[in-house]
């Protein structure tokens, strides 16, 4: 059953049962003091409301029959998956750079199995959800995301998570190039860097690549009364 989500720059209509809510990298690394972003000098002090808003969005999406996909960014303990000096990721990843500056952190930042890699305690995948590791910013790079979505007839993606201006935007952009309709819930995301990075990412998304809405509006669009209005 179709519903219409109020968004910028215009409303978008979609079928929740042929859509997915994507939770990007809600790991201790990105959302918890003592995690990678915090240790690398980024401000994570305002991530708690984002976690709560994602909980709300996930609950509403699951009740409406949407597929929930959780991403975890990171690599093996030896960081082979991160790429060596021949990879730009080796030079640009702030996690890798932080570990080179502070060798005592080696094997602790974004390493699979570590506390840093784990999802925050408040966000727990449920049976029927899909949890995917990813080795780069985009959730489409070297993951089965595209085939998972296409095999289910899913064309609409609703994004939450951290960081808006890095992994969220990268995944939404790649989805745009693959003909997916991407919506980001702005109050269920958080930037890496100053506030202007959040504003710039949202501007790019709503102007060039997708749509921007918020959690309350999203939940309202998934309510039974909204489906009744469309019908």
From Swiss-Prot:
Family matches, as Gene3D superfamilies: Isochorismatase-like
Listed name of the protein: Ureidoacrylate amidohydrolase RutB
MF GO annotations: hydrolase activity, acting on carbon-nitrogen (but not peptide) bonds, in linear amides
Disulfides per UniProt: none
Lineage of the species this protein comes from: Bacteria, Pseudomonadati, Pseudomonadota, Gammaproteobacteria, Enterobacterales
Residue positions of the active site: 25 (proton acceptor), 134, 167 (nucleophile)
Record field: catalytic activity: (Z)-3-ureidoacrylate + H2O + H(+) = (Z)-3-aminoacrylate + NH4(+) + CO2; (Z)-3-ureidoacrylate + H2O = (Z)-3-aminoacrylate + carbamate + H(+); (Z)-2-methylureidoacrylate + H2O + H(+) = (Z)-2-methylaminoacrylate + NH4(+) + CO2
Family, similarity comment: Belongs to the isochorismatase family. RutB subfamily.
Record flagged with keyword Hydrolase: yes
Species the sequence originates in: Escherichia coli O9:H4 (strain HS)
EC number(s) on file: 3.5.1.110
């Amino acid at each position: 059953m179709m519903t219409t989500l109020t968004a910028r720059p215009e409303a978008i209509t979609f079928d929740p049962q042929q859509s997915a809510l994507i939770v990007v990298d809600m790991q201790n690394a990105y959302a918890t003091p003592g995690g990678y972003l915090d240790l690398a000098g980024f401000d994570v002090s305002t991530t708690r409301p984002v976690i709560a808003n994602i909980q709300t969005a996930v609950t509403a999406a699951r009740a409406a029959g949407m597929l929930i996909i959780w991403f975890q960014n990171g690599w093996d303990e030896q960081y082979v998956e991160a790429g060596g000096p021949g990879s730009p990721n080796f030079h640009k990843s702030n996690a890798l750079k932080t570990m080179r500056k502070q060798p005592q952190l080696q094997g602790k930042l974004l390493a699979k199995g570590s506390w840093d890699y784990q999802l925050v305690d408040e966000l727990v995948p449920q049976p029927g959800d899909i949890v995917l590791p990813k080795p780069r910013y985009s959730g489409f790079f070297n993951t089965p995301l595209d085939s998972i979505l296409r095999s289910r007839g899913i064309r609409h993606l609703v994004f939450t998570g951290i960081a808006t201006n890095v992994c969220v935007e990268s995944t939404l952009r790649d989805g745009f190039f693959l003909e997916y309709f991407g919506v980001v819930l702005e109050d269920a995301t958080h930037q890496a860097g100053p506030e202007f990075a959040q504003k710039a990412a949202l501007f790019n998304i709503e102007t060039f690549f997708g749509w921007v809405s918020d959690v309350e509006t999203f939940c309202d669009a998934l309510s039974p009364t909204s489906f009744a209005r469309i019908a």
